Amino acid sequence: MIPRRHHFKPAPQPTVQVLQPPDEDAPSLTITMLGAGQEVGRSCCVIEHRGKKIVCDAGLHPAQPGIGALPFIDELDWSTVDAMLITHFHVDHAAALPYIMEKTNFKDGNGKVYMTHATKAIYGLTMMDTVRLNDQNPDTSGRLYDEADVQSSWQSTIAVDYHQDIVIAGGLRFTPYHAGHVLGASMFLIEIAGLKILYTGDYSREEDRHLVMAEIPPVKPDVMICESTFGVHTLPDRKEKEEQFTTLVANIVRRGGRCLMPIPSFGNGQELALLLDEYWNDHPELQNIPVYFASSLFQRGMRVYKTYVHTMNANIRSRFARRDNPFDFRFVKWLKDPQKLRENKGPCVIMSSPQFMSFGLSRDLLEEWAPDSKNGVIVTGYSIEGTMARTLLSEPDHIESLKGGNVPRRLTVKEISFGAHVDYAQNSKFIQEIGAQHVVLVHGEASQMGRLRAALRDTYAAKGQEINIHTPKNCEPLTLTFRQERMVKAIGSLAATRPEHGTSVKGLLVSKDFSYTLLSPADLHDFTGLSTSTIIQKQGVAISVDWAVVRWYLEGMYGEVEEGVEEEGKAAFIIMNGVQVVQISPTAVELRWKSSSSNDMIADSALALLLGIDGSPATAKLTASPNKHACNHSNSHSHTDLYPHTYPGDKSAKDVASNPEFERLRMFLEAHFGHVEGPNLRPPLPPGADGDGNDDKDKDGDDWLTMDVKLDNQTARIDLISMRVESESAELQKRVETVLEMALTTVKSLSQTFLGGGLDVDMVKVEPNESDS
């Protein structure tokens, strides 16, 4: 440590230095739809923020064959995905998962796939069923994966619980919430570096016979990515739908017809089975007419439904508690052999997959029953554009047969949606309750989505509110920018006492996963497991000039240099309170400093300055005159001191008042205000004397230097020690303070600017003379 030759009082060091974040840390969010952008089907949403990448859902388009059914997977480097979140098991949300996990470079990265326990259980069954159905399709190009791919993807997925907070390294976390819709369906509240995104998937805000409705997360998200399946349509309430449905079914079988209901193996099929079983129980006249579900997958899935009763609504849970299993149907039976239908020509009700009737048993039964007007088909779910289910709704005279040719269509076609999607009223209310700053509409046809956006804007405008609604197309990135505050949490000994407002708190700033913690260096190991080390750096430089010349250059660059001796007695300078320049020999100096971002910059600049001394014209001028040269020998002779060493006690009042920094400050103020007086210095009052108007003293009686700015008969006095401004005119005081701030930035030396101090002023005590007595 170098002994100081005089007292130097530096300004307080900055407590925390916060660097600008890199580009990838910019507070913007990018949402790219690889599917379900202004369409229904192949849901796949990519969310990117602060270097993190999340994919929500990976479905197939039911109306497209083969590769064309996949999302636009070539638009993404799947090895960079941090997590995939699957909302539910439906084909248009999960059926592309085996292909992505097994046939892309997703497996080369570190990403994991997450879904709820019930979704994972049913996912394995439905994907195996998808493989089986694809194998039945004569078009082999539709076979995207096999059973081995499905099994491998199923084993790699991670099952999570509702309301479970899942934390992934790097500031990424998510929580699943109930979405209604189907068993196991969830919406995900995703948080990336403090930014919250709610991805709803398909959801329902109406409790049915076995499912709870979608819940509102307790935390308000910044962005809501929301389905828009039904657009502005308003659906009848549940009781009305159930009455219409059961009446339609009863009318078909009472006229001797056969009723076909194409359903997914899981989802509204179980809901309809509960409804029909209850209706048949209440109508004995129908109990001789069989009701079938023609799906082995449906039968196997009932075991899953019984396993996850705890996720269903209170009615189902209470019935199970009474040992009354609602899924033990009395009248709805499993049709193991479809040939039985061809042998028995009487009326019946059959629920069969697949839902969209593109192929499979539901398509076979449609073609077989279509010519008979006594028969009927009831479409109970949402029909995607391009599927046979959507074609039937237009009631064509003929339908295309998979065997070739056309089949006359005489059976009745009705639609009653039990698809467990929200209608406009439910969707609009839910969006308002969530209260997100941005709403992104997905999973809806372009026309429906456009009408929904207009209706939502009108709803908010009527309340005098604004909302940002976006409807991105597939592969068109949507970028949203957010203004986020960075909060620093003090822990350990720093948090022992609450600091007063305006006080400085100094400590180590620890950043992890986009969160910031301030703690004392002594607490670092206890709270983080990290240890600290101090790096002392040294750099030798050869010089050929006198030690005084070195000081002259350092003073010219940094404004103030402290002179002293280091521990071994060698002469040294201290630059800006951080870097030592030690004279290790007459022809060499050594820079020494504790490594830090600020000290490294100072050392770099000092090194560049010292290396340029020999080639500088100023050096030649300084050493050209006799006795003003570098002395590299031991002969004793006089030298002209390039820097007159003056200390506080050596400076007279006249010396201080004529400080060139004050002169530059006065010139700066005169350019703005015109009339400036000073610097002024008056001796203190003698003991016992009365006041004479001289108030330029501190509490110890030492004189203060002042400067007076006069404008329009008003005066503002500047204390040149503290740089405070006082005036009876508040307006003039404010103007002078503003100009003074600019002036100090201009006239201060580099060291004063860096350390945050004022002008270099030493306190001067002036003895009173007789004229002042």
From Swiss-Prot:
Presence of keyword Metal-binding: yes
Top-tier EC class: hydrolase
Localization in the cell: Nucleus
GO-annotated molecular function: 5'-3' RNA exonuclease activity; metal ion binding; RNA binding; RNA endonuclease activity
Record's keyword annotation contains Metal-binding: yes
Biased composition (Polar residues): 624-637
InterPro entries reported in the protein's UniProt record: Beta_Casp, CPSF73-100_C, MBL, Metallo-B-lactamas, RibonucZ/Hydroxyglut_hydro, RMMBL
Residues noted as binding Zn(2+) 1 in the record, renumbered to the chain: 88, 90, 181, 202
A GO-annotated cellular component: mRNA cleavage and polyadenylation specificity factor complex
GO biological process per UniProt: mRNA 3'-end processing by stem-loop binding and cleavage
Positions annotated to bind Zn(2+) 2: 92-93, 202, 443
Catalytic residues as annotated in Swiss-Prot or TrEMBL: 421
Annotated spans, Disordered: 1-22, 624-656, 677-702
TM annotation in the entry: none
Pfam families for the chain: Beta-Casp (PF10996), CPSF73-100_C (PF11718), Lactamase_B_6 (PF16661), RMMBL (PF07521)
EC number: 3.1.27.-
Protein keywords: Endonuclease, Hydrolase, Metal-binding, mRNA processing, Nuclease, Nucleus, Zinc
Function: Component of the cleavage factor I (CF I) involved in pre-mRNA 3'-end processing.
Family to which this protein belongs: Belongs to the metallo-beta-lactamase superfamily. RNA-metabolizing metallo-beta-lactamase-like family. CPSF2/YSH1 subfamily.
Name listed for the protein in its UniProt record: Endoribonuclease YSH1
Organism: Cryptococcus neoformans var. neoformans serotype D (strain JEC21 / ATCC MYA-565) (Filobasidiella neoformans)
Lineage: Eukaryota, Fungi, Dikarya, Basidiomycota, Agaricomycotina
